[in-house]
Amino acid sequence: MTAFNDRLGALSDAEGRKALAGLRRGLEREALRITSCCQLALDPHPKALGSALTHSRITTDYSEALLEFITPVSGNIEDLLEGLTETHAYTLKHLDGQKLWPVSMPCYVGDVKDIPIAQYGTSNTGRMKTLYRKGLTYRYGALMQIISGVHFNFSLSSDLWPRLHALSGSSLSLDEFISESYFGLIRNYRRLVWVLPYLFGASPAICGSFLKGQKTSLEFEKTAGGTLYLPYATSLRMSDLGYTNKEQASLNISYDSLHDYLQGIREAICLPSAKFAEIGVKVDGEYRQLNANVLQIENEFYAPIRAKRVTRKGEKPSEALARAGVEYIEVRALDVNPFSPVGVEASQLRFLDVFLLYCLLSDSPKSDAVCESEITSNLRAVIHEGRKPGLALSRQGEPVTLKAWLLELFDEFDKLASLLDIDGSDYAEALAQWRMAVEDPALTLSGRVHAAVVEQGMNHGDFVMGLAAKYQDFFLSYPLSPGVEAGFQAEAASSLAAQAEIEASDEESFDEYLKGYFKGVPCALS
């Protein structure tokens, strides 16, 4: 018997199963606005959608054109997706004919200098958000910043933690145990993160225009229509073409404990970068970036998973974690699913439930340099050639085929599904669906995109525009109830009023505001 099986056995009674199934989830989906002429939208964030600074469900990410839809936390997957669908529908009805780009990698961008950085008004808070994005532009270029994805927020039931705490025999307080357990989940997730691009990576091909003279070591093949692809790739979004930060490669952020993690993040925020110093911070009276450190602020740290806690007003993410520990985790390794109108589907979320619970309930040893190297090489292999027949990965120094490893994992996942399926078979069905994609890589999301674009000879841009038009029709005809419509209209108005109130209440200059903000940034744990 393994520790995983022991823990499952201890949770197999009715109360344990109910506690295990009491998961809380949230979604964040990014999507570019595109014009009817297939170009990136260059107009401001639509007023009908409210204030991107203060709206709880509709905001912007890097660009005015890059919408971000945020769901409230929910314990029900169907409710979660219904809410996300309603947000999309309301938005499309107020985009004046514009569509949403339904894949992660952008295409018809035009001149990258024209990509509009997100604007949040004239308040110090809003100006800082825009300046941070301006800094990202100088540091990494605008094109990388408009790559979109889906983030999955996940937390366990408050009823489950006392049972796991008692089962562990830990001498830690319950809050300390919760943080320790979430970091155990994170360590296992990082070892197994390659599973997600294999199943859910959906960017094996890109428009030829995306490279625009970029140097790359990737040996792309080209279709007659100009689409670039790697024959067995899964997620070019997660490759060096996508959202990565070479300056961060030297950072040593530890996931061994909350303390070590916070120490690493705080050191990174205060670590000067010679490369970024060359940009300048304030040149000829105009800011180019918040500072010249490796990270301007904590949000710049790129990772496929993050430990999170809801922040109080004015609180930085690390301060919230230091104050009260980990509250939930954020999965950031998901491509937009082009076969779903909202970029993600229920079977993926059920798989993620099982996958993350497996990471939580399995033993999670601390990492070392050899383990970190293995994590990196396995992920890179799956990103570049995950669908390659017989692809071998490394598991604790020993070679193992991706397929054999995945089938072993799915046998363990099935045990969890049997406990989660209290009234039905939704989890078993989701696992059965994705197990078929282990047996046949053509059934992965990247396999389906490859079939549509490469095997059928369709230009990548045409393929995506066809989906964009289809989903536009779907959302424009989606029936929003009068109450839901009124709710969105009310929040649009109240968010604009809230932004105006913030702007009116500012009393210090922007220079003073920034000085005060960074004065409060500790470079080490006390």
UniProtKB/Swiss-Prot annotation:
The record's EC number reads 6.3.2.2
**Family assignment?**
Belongs to the glutamate--cysteine ligase type 1 family. Type 1 subfamily.
Q: What GO annotations for molecular function exist for this entry?
A: ATP binding; glutamate-cysteine ligase activity; metal ion binding
The protein's name in its UniProt record? Glutamate--cysteine ligase
- The answer to whether keyword Nucleotide-binding applies is yes
Q: Which PANTHER family match?
A: GLUTAMATE--CYSTEINE LIGASE (PTHR38761:SF1)
**Reactions accelerated catalytically:** L-cysteine + L-glutamate + ATP = gamma-L-glutamyl-L-cysteine + ADP + phosphate + H(+)
The gene is gshA
Question: What EC class is this?
Answer: ligase
Q: Domain of life here? A: Bacteria
Q: In which pathway does it act?
A: Sulfur metabolism; glutathione biosynthesis; glutathione from L-cysteine and L-glutamate: step 1/2
Q: Which GO terms describe its cellular component?
A: cytosol
HAMAP family, alphabetized: Glu_cys_ligase
Instruction: List the Gene3D superfamilies.
Output: 3.30.590.20
